[in-house]
Amino acid sequence: MTQILLLLLSITMLSSQEKEYFQQEVNYQIDVSLNDEDHTLSAYEKIEYKNNSPDELTFIWFHIWPNAYKNDSTAYAKQAGPRSSFAKSDSLERGFIDSLDFKVNGKQVKWTLHPEWIDVVKIELNEVLKPGQTINIETPFFVKIPKVFSRLGHTGKHYEITQWYPKPAVYDSKGWHPMPYLNQGEFYSEFGTFDVKITLPKDYKVMATGDLVNGEEEYAWLKGLTAFTDSLNSLSKDELKKWIKKSQKTKSLENRPNARSSTFEFKTLHFRQTNVHDFAWFADKKWLVQKGELSLPSRPEPITLWSFYLPKNAELWRNSIEYLHDSGYWFSKYYGDYPYNHITAVDGDLSAGGGMEYPNITVIATMPSKHLLELVIMHEVGHNWFYGIIGSNERYHTWMDEGLNDYSNIRYWEDKYKGENERFVVLELVQDRLGIAKNMKYSWFSYLQYALSAKNKNVQPLNLKADEYTGANYGLNYSKTGVFTRFLHHYLGNEKMDEIMKAYYERWKYKHPYPEDFEMVFKDKTDKGLTWYFDGVFNTTNYIDFSIRKKGRTYLVSNHGTMSSPVEIVFYGKGQQEIERVWLENVENNAEIKSPEKALYAVIDPDEFMPDVKRENNSTKSSIRLHWVWDQPTYYDHDLNLTPWAKYNYYNGLTPGIMIYKGGPGFTGLTALEPMWDLNNEKLVGKIYKVFNYDENNLFGKSSLSIGAMRLHGTKSGNVKYSGSTNTKEVSTNFSFQLNHNSLNETAFDTSYYESGSRFIIAGIKCSLI
């Protein structure tokens, strides 16, 4: 009987917890006009605010984020710092919002600025807003659009109108969430419907969140413009470059900062979108326009794809519709179908990173390569799922959108470019033409971003607010979450991970999940212990470092890291034949595995899913791999990079040769041999050296030991040097100790100044406090 009562009590408690979830509904009507001579917006906003909470509300926090650009005292200005372009700008380049006059249900209300932030205001309600009640809030507002410093802004007559209107802060089960605008730190807003009318000069091309209402004429005009863009894309690469060069010779008068509007005719575009929590729009007269479609099995009508880009970037953006198509396709396949009617990318002048996402639309900064452009478009389109449809609190839990999106980016690249060995090209000249780093994968690129900082003593966990991170650590929300979730995917398997992530999407679309909600979906779908992921990855700075070595007929797996994650061991026989795969759980110190029959060697995580910070000790066998200059290493193999090398000095003259080295990003040291031929004296000269790097957890802090020998410049020498640094908030200490042994060639030096022979020399002992 007691057990039955406890069970009923548990069910009742769970039921009450489920009922605790609520979210407010906020619907907008905004009429806005753009003045492109003064770079201002004049607008009127009406908001329908429905209180779905169980609480009575006496006030509402509002964000008026254009005020972030008003002066040097805002949270944004302080975060940007004294060396930022904003700090060096004048008042004419800055922005603000004013002319606010809030009314609730037709009656004026009192409102005050937040005590710390001038871009947050508090509206005092004349009457208590009870659960289930709806009020109507309205206000005029005027925005001076700043120069592009962060997200909202203009460059000449190019406009990026984002975070531009007064919007209520989120009120959820954890209370109010007022927050100032920041560059490092994104957003959290209520879902609802946006009905926005934009009036501006007729010759602007405009794209925004939502669909045009009665927009047949505007859509027909845009579609007509695609014919010219299609004709450009039919040109050869050289012909297109000539056209771009020619188009850039004539400077557009309409884009000069103080130019008058090129037309006195205006148009009003009416956009509407349901189930979103933000609205952004972009306008430019010069954009080229491309259009495409994405068909999904469950949708009767295709999704329209729009790409708007500047003529100077025509060659780079010619495949942008493909990138939009593939992003929408793969994310829909992974999580659930895209629910809106268009996916759009616009070419921008963004200062807040490589791109920025908004519902239905993303703005992209200039990129150096096609792969990077595809990556950024795909990443920002992916935010329609993680931030857009699943509306987590980006400011408080950055990893929930950026990190899960980064994991999805890796998966996209692996699936789309599987036939090309998942190549990721950052610099086309270096990788495609010179053949350097030609086999670099995007998954390795993401791994490296995490691994290089994982053992840093100043590293921060992922459970902090965005503004609490240093600039270096903020990126871990992307890379660390991405690589560990990819590893979790490998551990659980494709089928199970897909089931879980699709369930997460269905359970939380158009809602505001927290980390515990994300974890609960996994608990509901798998009985595997995932504490190492949900606690170890997000709440600690623990890292993975396993090694393996052979002991007769057994293999010893050792944990040198601070995280006890699962670890996969793969055994191989003759001809690299795979014999068996074994997963070990919770290896805290050491574990022995009996060798399978015919197994000759074993490798930890040969497919490189596990974010082990030191992969050099992950195999009992090492092969020799030769690379031209440098390429992505395996770490545990002998990855030898061959680089043409030459030096010149008075005694030897020109000394051509080659550098053979092992090391680089992700290695704990460097080994190098530099054989060269002395053309003056016709003999072999060169250097050989080895560097051991120690991380900041070492006794002497971050340090290195180098040992080398050289025959060059008329000398034979040996050198041992130990140097390092220790850093605290109060003081930084740099130190070095160096011991040389030199043998001087009497024909290379003036004997009146130098004595030939060999001797030991203490070259330096140095210590400095900063």
Describe each model-derived feature in a short phrase.
Residues 13-42, 155, 531-532, 643-645:
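N-terminal, polar/Ser/Thr-rich
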Residues 25-26, 271, 300-558, 564, ...:
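Hydrophobic alpha-helical and helix-loop surface patches within well-folded domains
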Residues 45-47, 51, 64-66, 133-147, ...:
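Short, hydrophobic/aromatic-enriched beta-strand segments in well-ordered soluble domains
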Residues 50, 83-157, 247, 253-264, ...:
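A surface-exposed beta-strand-loop module
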Residues 62-108, 199-204:
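Solvent-exposed beta-hairpin/edge-strand motifs
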Residues 72-85, 142-194, 214-216, 221-222, ...:
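Glycine/proline-rich low-complexity spacer/linker segments in large multi-domain proteins
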Residues 168-176, 185-378, 407, 419:
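Hydrophobic helix-coil surface modules that form long, contiguous segments used
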Residues 583-585, 593-598, 605-699, 734, ...:
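Outer-membrane beta-barrel initiation region
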